[in-house]
Regions:
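Active-/binding-site microenvironments in catalytic and ligand-binding cores
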Residues: 1-159
C-alpha cells in the first residue's frame, strides 16, 4: 500500500492531512535544466502559498523509472529548501524523483510536510509553462489514509 502512493506524479504527504485550500494555488516555475545541485533562484518571484515548480528536464533525459532517474537526479540544496519554507510555499514540485537524493529524500519530505509544504514528484509536461508569467495550479490527490504518498493529477490553468 505504501509503495503504491509513490508511483507516477504524487505528493509526499508523510501521513499528514492535505489541506483542501491547497487544491488551487498560484504557480511559479524555475528553469533549472543542467543544474545538479539547485541553489540559486529568484526568490522575489515567490509569494506565500505558491506552488513552486522546478523544471530540470531530467524526466525526459533519463526516462521515468530508470536506475539513473532514481539515483542521479538533480536536487535542491538544503539552504534553498529552507528559503522556500521561510517563504511559506504550499507545494514544491519537481520533474524528477525528489527534491533530495538517497538517504536524505524521506527525511526532507517529512521536514517539508512538518512545515506545511508538500513535495510533488515526477511532474511532466512542464516545458509548456516556461513562457507563462502567471498561472494557476490545480492539484487533485487521490484520497487514501495512512500513506506517505498520494497519487495526484496536477493541472495548470494559463491565461
Amino acid at each position: 500500500k505504501a509503495n503504491f502512493g509513490h508511483l507516477g506524479t504524487h505528493f509526499d504527504v508523510m501521513n499528514k492531512e492535505f489541506p483542501l485550500s491547497y487544491l488551487e494555488r498560484n504557480g511559479v516555475i524555475f528553469d533549472v535544466r543542467g543544474i545538479d545541485e539547485i541553489e540559486v533562484i529568484d526568490l522575489e518571484k515567490i509569494r506565500s502559498g505558491d506552488f513552486v515548480i522546478f523544471y530540470t528536464g531530467f524526466l525526459e533525459k533519463a526516462g521515468y523509472g530508470t536506475k539513473e532517474y532514481f539515483q542521479a537526479h538533480p536536487q535542491l540544496s538544503n539552504n534553498l529548501i529552507e528559503k522556500l519554507l521561510d517563504k511559506k510555499v504550499s507545494i514544491i514540485g519537481i520533474d524528477c524523483a525528489g527534491i533530495r537524493r538517497g538517504k536524505e529524500h524521506t527525511p526532507m519530505d517529512q521536514y517539508c510536510a512538518d512545515h506545511n509544504a508538500f513535495v510533488v514528484e515526477n511532474l511532466d509536461n512542464l516545458e509548456s509553462l516556461l513562457m507563462q508569467n502567471e498561472f494557476t495550479i490545480n492539484t487533485y490527490p487521490m484520497k487514501f489514509s495512512e500513506m506517505t504518498g498520494l497519487p495526484c493529477r496536477v493541472v495548470a490553468k494559463v491565461d
